[in-house]
Amino acid sequence: EKTMKTVGVVIPIYNVEKYLRECLDSVVNQTYKNLQVVLVNDGSTDENSLNIAKEYTLKDERFILFDKENGGLSSARNVGIEFFSKEYDFKNITQELKENSLVEFKLDNEDNPYNIYKIYKSSNFFKNKDELLNFKAPDIDYIIFLDSDDYWELNCIEECVPRMDGVEVVWFDYNKIYEKDCLEKKDEWTWFNCYNMGIKKDIIISDEWLDKYCNIQTFAFVWSGMIAFNYLSNQKIKFLDYIFHQDVYFGFMVFFKSNKIFLLNKKIINYRIRSNATTLRQSKIDKQIILPKYLDFLSKFYNKNEDAKKYYSLFSWSKMVEKAIEDSFYDEKNIITNYFLPSLCMQLFQKDINKNLDPLNIGIYINFSKVIFKMFRLKHQNIIFNTNLYGTAKQRIQNQLCYKLGQTMIINSKSIIGILFMPIYLLSTFLNYKQDQKIYYQKIKKDPTLKLPPLENYPDYQEALKYKEHLSYKLGKILLESFKTWHKGGLFRFP
């Protein structure tokens, strides 16, 4: 019997007293029980968010609660990742175990960059004082994020876990829950549908997702899926701290670096669209009426919170551009440079900023983004033109002589007549290829611009290299090699 997989759940909390119970009840009552739940109170200033979190932590031994300074969604989620990565050492504040009480810890690490004040855990979790003194983070197999104003269907985890076998990500769909006084126009649009409309299979590879990304040019992902924790740790994927739109960078990295993604076409999370949202389909932090505490300094420069948020949104895109440039140095396939960086720059391309109202000096990134975006737009236009004119790298490889010869051999080896007449079919393929080559050289003599560019210049070059692993290509290559050495008996060595 398979060991039951452990799922780590990370829930950031900020001023959500109205919604938090519904969220946490959906976790407590999951049909799949083997959960380890991290609540991160991100400096809530309302009356009850922290108290509700403490109440659930006391009741459920699977919960642990971190209380920290306000730093935004990214910092809160990163606390969860770092806890499960066993990066934290704990020091007891509580020395003696009392039944049905909260045990308090503080961090024993030298650094405490997120300014974690205290950590709480139910005393009922600990069998004895020795366990209390040696408390460590649990091992988990998978990780999932949940925002504290959203809630799961009760079978959410049970649907995901069996489908995690052999993939890095299970990606599922979501319901939209509109608040009564919400002004946003209702629609059925979701990221899942946007990317997966018409796909019949359950599992896709990262390249298939990337093909869609190239057309759509934007993507976001955090809470609509489950992720293999070893994969997340090994790839060192975390959230960018102190920015809006955290799901953009995180989502791209999770999907781009993955191998296989399971498409779970079920709506098993309820995504709440709140009435005080200032911008649509942006990070949940934009839905707060007041500025988060860590953005207080912007009120010195901007009279309206809305203007401050717009400025900070531009700063967030600028930080992503900066990080993408840094990460591109380690990306051998140049996917970040060719696809992700231009899409980030697109967000800043038409933006201008008042130099006197730029406390974070993002003007330089906006100007840089304009240059990059213009450059890539020109390159993209050339790629489209070249593809229309020159075809694709895949087509080029399929039109090579070795591929055509191998294909001829495979097709005609299925019948006795085909095998008997194989030499004639191969000769015919060879002569047709030579005729095509002759016509091609005549064309480029008249018009040199029709000369095919090097294969490496095609946007699908890396993917096209897989075609050289096809049996057709390999058979044809062996046949051509044997013809080259026929005078040494090469033909008789042909397998």
Residue ranges with predicted function:
Residues E96-L97, N270, T337, F421-M422, ...:
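Sparse recognition of residues in long alpha-helices and their boundaries
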Residues N15, E22, N155, Y312-S316, ...:
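Generic recognition of stable, solvent-exposed alpha-helical segments in well-folded globular domains
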Residues K91-N92, A228, F250, K267, ...:
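Generic detector of short, well-ordered, non-transmembrane alpha-helical segments enriched
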Residues Q398, I424-E469, G489-P495:
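Short linear elements at protein peripheries
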Residues G72, F219, S224, L263, ...:
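Generic detector of ordered secondary-structure context
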Residues R272-Q400, K404-I411, S415, L452-Y458, ...:
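C-terminal subregions of glycosyltransferases and related glycan-biosynthesis enzymes
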Residues G406-Q435, G476-P495:
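Alpha-helical membrane-targeting segments
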Residues E1-L295:
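Nucleotide-sugar donor-binding/catalytic module of glycosyltransferases
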